[in-house]
């Protein structure tokens, strides 16, 4: 039984995924998916690539998640799962790419600039 690993990132979140054949159990940092992500929306985001391929009950997934917030972590995990599924079966790549699961979202926080209170916000200007 082979174990396939993949990495996914989003904002400050990093997801390392280890996929093996099994019964559909997803374990995140030694906790169950429903325990780690109580929100059903985030659970749905994580399972999207599996549901698209109809592989929700085929694989056991172990995950190391660190950094970021809940939404960033769930999207990093979705990317990592999609990448791992392609390593398992390369023919699924077109279907996952069409749904946008293979694209790394490059948006992240813009840095704060000196002489300004935030990244884009300027200090209040006084004419007189």
UniProtKB/Swiss-Prot annotation:
Annotated spans, Disordered: 105-128
One Gene Ontology term, aspect cellular component: cytosolic small ribosomal subunit
Keywords carried by this UniProt record? Ribonucleoprotein, Ribosomal protein
> What protein name is recorded for this chain?
Small ribosomal subunit protein uS9
| Database matches in SUPFAM superfamilies | Ribosomal protein S5 domain 2-like
Family, per the entry?
A: Belongs to the universal ribosomal protein uS9 family.
Lineage, uppermost ranks: Bacteria, Pseudomonadati, Bacteroidota, Bacteroidia, Bacteroidales
According to the UniProt entry, which residue ranges have a biased composition of type Basic residues? Answer: 114-128
Write one Pfam family the protein is assigned to: Ribosomal_S9
A GO BP annotation? translation
Name the Gene Ontology molecular function terms of this record: RNA binding; structural constituent of ribosome
